[in-house]
Structures are given as C-alpha cells and as structure tokens.
From Swiss-Prot:
The chain crosses the membrane at residues 46-65, 69-91. This is UPF0208 membrane protein PMI1770. Belongs to the UPF0208 family. GO terms for cellular component: plasma membrane. It comes from Proteus mirabilis (strain HI4320). NCBIfam families: PRK01816.1.
Amino acid sequence: MNEPTVTPPGFFKKLRLGNEYLKTWPVEKQLAPVFPENRMIKATRFGIRYMPPIAIFTLTWQIALGGDLGPAITTALFACSLPMQGLWWLGKRAATPLPAVLLNWFYEIREKFEQAGIALAPVEKTPTYLSLAHLLKRAFKQLDRSFLDDV
C-alpha cells in the first residue's frame, strides 16, 4: 500500500489530494448508504467532464446574443468552479482522521488481511479517510465480501 503522507494541505494540495481520493475510493453500492463519497465522486466526475463545455457554451451563447460580458464570465466561472468544489471537499475529507467507529472497522479489515496471510504496510500515523480508501480498494480486490458485515 503506497500511501502518501497526509498533512493539512494548502488549497492546490487539497485539490490534488481530492483527485487522488477520487481515483482511490472504491465506488461500490454496499458503501453508498454509509459514506457520502459515492455521491460526491459521481457529481465531481460529472462536473469535470461536462462543466467546462457548458461554461464555454453559455459564454459564447450570451456573447452571441448581445448579452453583457460580466454576467457571461460570472456564469462561466461558476460552472468551472463546481468540479473544483467537489475536489476540494474530497481533499478535505481525505485528510480527515477516521472517527472511532471507523477506526475500529479499519483495524478489523487489516486483521482480516493478516488472517488471510496478506501482508500490509504498518500504519504509521492516525489513519485518515484516504488510508481507509486504499484499504477498502485492496479489500474489494483481495478479500471476500464478509468484511462488509460490520458496516
């Protein structure tokens, strides 16, 4: 498990951390009732894909129809900021330490890896949601679904 050192990041580091979290989190329907990440990742991916073209379309449409430049630029900037807001939220969430209930579940999943004879890197710091994402991604690939019974 190659986990980066998670420190309280600045704005751009938080966006990069959010992008890593977006790519790491396993979007599984069993996790949807417990974690808001599935909905946030889906909305952020939608925003990354469709908001820049929508921003360009609204900008050119308002200018072509003789609208003012100020509102056109404001609308385009707002549309482009939506995916950044999602990445920022994901980055903030990724750096958040796990609450006690999830911390216990985190260590239970690690224990199931040990029982299965699968080696894991030792936990160096307080586990964060990014650590949980790495662990869950690996668990969905290498363990049976019994680790979800405690969710």
